[in-house]
A protein has these predicted regions:
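C-terminal outer-membrane beta-barrel translocator/porin domains of Gram-negative envelope proteins
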Residues: 2-163, 180-182, 248-252
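Short proline/glycine-enriched turn/loop segments at secondary-structure junctions
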Residues: 190-192, 211-216, 234-239
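Extended hydrophobic-aromatic, low-complexity segments
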Residues: 159-169, 180-184, 212-217
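Membrane-embedded beta-strand positions of outer-membrane beta-barrel proteins
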Residues: 20-24, 57-59, 151, 170-174, ...
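Outer-membrane beta-barrel transmembrane domain signature
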Residues: 68, 177-199, 206-209
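Short, contiguous acidic/charged loop-to-helix segments that flank catalytic cores in large enzymes
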Residues: 135-143, 184-196, 236
């Protein structure tokens, strides 16, 4: 059993031309748990305006430690971990999204569930780290500690009116982050993390909010992202810069 104590703090703030939310989450395995781990997570989300352009940023930082981690509770490189997916009505079971889209391989896939470090361009990728002799040192698709910066620049105002009027939004995005499965100490923190991974591209969202007689259903967003650039692309890709695409439900952050 993955028994755990969760303590969550949230602080909202405003400043000139923007606003933000800071979340601090402490999670620790508790009495009766089959696991032994704890983690503290900081997430700062900011919304800024520059004339007609909207800029969103998300700064994420997590430090975790423990001798036995629940796999579903680990930090994910690309998006939500298994625990977060179970909390979503769209991903907890086969239906709108097939569970095959949650598998990991030596290449990326075409579905992104927001969460974790949120490096959306690496969805479904095992993210291997290599030794100097070319052998695989680790798979960094998940870990226990990590940091990331996610950015979206919304330029919907400059789209043709017919698109804006049909609830279509567009943005440029970039994500970058590092991750590790090692317990962080004063001695190893400089070398414990993986090399930086980053992605960038363009995305579009469409909001569904007209369900006729089913008026109690909350609106939800269908997202189409094209992460053209990966700085550490899979060996199966032809280049760092190429056509890639993925579908997501709800905004990335």
């Amino acid at each position: 059993m993955n028994n755990r104590i969760d303590i969550d703090f949230e602080h909202k703030y405003k400043y000139h031309e923007g606003s933000g939310t800071l979340n601090i989450l402490f999670q620790s395995s508790s009495i009766g748990s089959d696991y032994d781990y704890n983690k503290i997570t900081f997430v700062a989300k900011n919304n800024n305006s520059l004339k007609k352009i909207k800029i969103k940023t998300r700064l994420f930082f997590q430090v975790g430690s423990g001798t036995k981690w629940a796999e579903e509770s680990k930090l994910s490189l690309a998006g939500a971990n298994k625990e977060e997916m179970m909390s979503s009505k769209f991903t907890r079971a086969d239906g709108i999204v097939n569970s095959d889209n949650f598998d990991y391989d030596f290449t990326t896939n075409n579905f992104h569930s927001p969460g974790g470090l949120n490096l959306r361009g690496y969805s479904g990728y095992l993210a291997p780290e290599f030794n100097e002799d070319g052998t695989i040192k680790s798979f960094d698709y998940n870990g226990t500690s990590g940091a990331a910066l996610n950015t979206e620049i919304d330029f919907t105002y400059y789209l043709p009116y017919v698109l804006r009027n049909n609830k279509i939004k567009s943005y440029l995005f970039a994500d970058a982050g590092i991750i590790t499965s090692k317990n962080i100490t004063v001695e190893n923190f400089k070398n414990a993390f993986s090399d930086l991974r980053a992605d960038a591209g363009i995305g579009f969202t469409y909001t569904l909010d007209n369900f006729g007689p089913l008026e109690t259903i909350n609106p939800f967003v269908i997202r189409f992202d094209m992460p053209f650039f990966l700085n550490r692309a899979p060996a199966t890709d032809e280049d760092f810069l190429q056509m890639r695409w993925l579908i997501g439900i709800n905004k990335a952050f």
